[in-house]
Amino acid sequence: MRKTFRIKKPEEFQHVFNKHRSVANKYFIVYQMDKPEQKHFRVGLSVSKKVGKAHERVWVKRRIRQSLLELKPELPQELDLLVIARPAAAHRSQKFLKNQMIHVLKLAKILKEENE
């Protein structure tokens, strides 16, 4: 995922936290904020030390980024997302984490249900 698709600055994270809608499941918490003037969606990732050691946290971040990259065509472009990984996300497969990401994005009404 290119750097222009990432939220990095602390004040940008804080802005999304303060003006957010959030949903969660056992593996992720997703905060979202609409930005109509934006040309593409942006994502901020947070994986705390509760998830595991540094290499495990990096592993989880890579899996989240890959899942979002695969879902990119289905995501609305005028959106900022913050994804916080919960400790249960450690030691899970890529396919499982992608399915959980789809689940939480459907709960947030970011992705459409198949039967709609």
Curated annotation (Swiss-Prot):
The keyword Disulfide bond does not apply. Keywords: Endonuclease, Hydrolase, Nuclease, RNA-binding, tRNA processing. It catalyses: Endonucleolytic cleavage of RNA, removing 5'-extranucleotides from tRNA precursor. GO terms for biological process: tRNA 5'-leader removal. Consists of a catalytic RNA component (M1 or rnpB) and a protein subunit. SUPFAM superfamilies: Ribosomal protein S5 domain 2-like. It holds the Pfam family Ribonuclease_P. This is Ribonuclease P protein component. It is an enzyme of class 3 (hydrolase). InterPro entries: Ribosomal_Su5_D2-typ_SF (IPR020568), Ribsml_uS5_D2-typ_fold_subgr (IPR014721), RNase_P (IPR000100). GO terms for cellular component: ribonuclease P complex. NCBIfam families: rnpA. Its EC number is 3.1.26.5. Belongs to the RnpA family. It comes from Leuconostoc mesenteroides subsp. mesenteroides (strain ATCC 8293 / DSM 20343 / BCRC 11652 / CCM 1803 / JCM 6124 / NCDO 523 / NBRC 100496 / NCIMB 8023 / NCTC 12954 / NRRL B-1118 / 37Y). It comes from the Bacteria. RNaseP catalyzes the removal of the 5'-leader sequence from pre-tRNA to produce the mature 5'-terminus. It can also cleave other RNA substrates such as 4.5S RNA. The protein component plays an auxiliary but essential role in vivo by binding to the 5'-leader sequence and broadening the substrate specificity of the ribozyme.
